[in-house]
Amino acid sequence: MSSKVQQEIADLKKLIRKWDKEYYVDSLPSVEDFVYDKHILRLQELESKYPEYKTLDSPTLKFGSDLLNDFKEVEHSAPILSLDKVYDLDLLKSWIDKIDFNNSFNISVEPKIDGCSIVLYYKDGVLEKALTRGNGKFGNDVTINVRTIRYIPLFLDEKVDLVLRGEVYITKENFLKINKFLEKPYTNSRNLASGILRRVDSREVANFPLNIFIYDFLNAGLEFKTNDLATARLKKLGFKVNPLIRFFDLKNSIGEVLNYIADITKKRDSFEYEIDGVVLKVSDFALRERLGYTAHHPKWAMAYKFEALSGFSRVNSIVVQVGRSGKITPVANIDKVFVSGAFITSATLHNQDYIRSIGLNVGDVVKVSRRGDVIPAVEMVINKFSTGFFKVPDNCPACKTAVVKEGAHFFCPNNNCPSVAVERIKYFCSKNCMDIEGFSDKIISFLFEKKFIFSEIDLYTFDFYKLLEFKGFKDRKINNLINSIEASKKKPFSKLLLSMGIKDLGENTIRLLFLNNLNSFSKLFKLCQDRYFAFSTLLKIKGIGEKIALNIIEAFNDSVMLNKFKFFENLEFKMEEVVAIDGENKLLAGKKFCITGTFNGYSRSIIIDKLKNKGAIFNTCVTGSLDFLIVGEKAGSKLKKALSLNIKIMSFEDIKSYLD
């Protein structure tokens, strides 16, 4: 047992040292922070359990070093420590709860910039030197390069001695621009900023648009009582401080702190710079000293780290998938990578034009994102190891029919394509449509492959007890499937209409139809028999354009689609849905809304549901076609955009009467 533990500790040390060099020296990390931290925690766990195997060279006693031989090493005036970190909000709250504020709650919150740490030393108001963090005791002297950063004042108006910590960064936009011209592109903006700062020729550094935020005033405690006062002084002296830093005191609660963190987390994609978390610090300098330090980090600060929104992986193969509309979508099979809290092994490539634009082929190393919890997608090629780019095949992979191009996408035109058929059934059963419980993609594919079902109507005629002969299907499971099918017959007509998969017909358009007295199968069918009259009628409805109008008319003249509707009508499905709009609710009926901010006592989802039930239509983003923006506390960028577009603003008080 002891030899196994020793070996695991030795292996962990070796691996962590390798990663430290990649991160701090080479600026080319091969693993995400989350993976690195997991290995550090495992090493700490083993060393705590078996202290006899803990050595003085353990990575848990130190933090990584960015020292390079190209620059002179200079000793810091005081240890430049790292930050303790958590990935869980409950752990963050526990850290806050443990601090004895002595009835004087004070804490600051600011984004954690993903850049290159720097320490600035001012003597009598003059920038004397600039050092990298290095190993915390010694740093590389990069003063000559730092002097080229326009946002760092070389001379101050006051003759003061300062020791400041800041984060040198490069904006997302400039990262993409610069990376295009580099022979060896960087994987992220942090590595690029770090690489630029360490260039030997300062004239080269001056050509790059480096930026900086000052986030710590290391000798502020000698002059100020709290961090907010010190920060105000820094601004007055001409230093750039992140405008998103916020100070909380007795008037605030921990809940408000957590809400602000949630707000930053939500908006991080809109920032011009990369952030990898949020930093919390005790504001009171006297309390900081009482809380003290470890050899690694101050006890008065904590970083809440985000799980990675993107990762880097190699494309092993590319397959094409056929959707319910026949659309051909290329998908990359990639090495497993951890992104946004999940391991992913595949990512969409959108379409042929997109593949061509990024020059992607099998074997390339790519950046993969999973922003907003959507389907993982390949963002860009990081390292090109192939020639040319992948080409979508000329024929559908499922039925071999020649594909046709419509806009940016290729489509399989065969209505009887097996892939199209099975995807339509999956869509019909999905949560947003008929929500037929128990019918997973796996079960639907199984039923289709065994030729038990060929379309959604077969779900209502198939004898499910035939499944008893197959492994995994027993009476209870089969009865649950049958009960789910029966329950689906009671779903409202809007759900059935959505489930039919009419191209571009979504929930909002269906609501518009219903609000304009087109709220039944018979009304829609009758209207669409006169194509020209139907087209002009539909175009009169605000929010319905030519494309959607033509798709609706085509659907209600398609024999296959009509046979499906007749089938469901014979099974006594609901073929009409009453939309009652009284005089009081006419303001909402058919109007397009968006919502932003927080609302005391109400979640946004509850407000949306209640207003939808009274005829409102909700968009997820602010566009020129919006009628109203509902604004709560701590409204974000949506409010700014709405004001620029002259969109009417509604407060919580304006809509409160509609929520009863």
Swiss-Prot record:
SUPFAM superfamilies: BRCT domain, DNA ligase/mRNA capping enzyme, catalytic domain, Nucleic acid-binding proteins, RuvA domain 2-like. CDD domains: BRCT_DNA_ligase_like, LIGANc. Its cofactor is Mg(2+); Mn(2+). Its EC number is 6.5.1.2. It comes from the Bacteria. Zn(2+) binds at residues 396, 399, 412, 417. Pfam families: BRCT, DNA_ligase_aden, DNA_ligase_OB. One of its GO terms (molecular function) is metal ion binding. The active site is at 112 (n6-amp-lysine intermediate). It is an enzyme of class 6 (ligase). Residues 583-660 form the BRCT domain. SMART domains: BRCT, HhH1, LIGANc. HAMAP family: DNA_ligase_A. DNA ligase that catalyzes the formation of phosphodiester linkages between 5'-phosphoryl and 3'-hydroxyl groups in double-stranded DNA using NAD as a coenzyme and as the energy source for the reaction. It is essential for DNA replication and repair of damaged DNA. This is DNA ligase. It comes from Borreliella burgdorferi (strain ATCC 35210 / DSM 4680 / CIP 102532 / B31) (Borrelia burgdorferi). The lineage of its organism: Bacteria, Pseudomonadati, Spirochaetota, Spirochaetia, Spirochaetales.
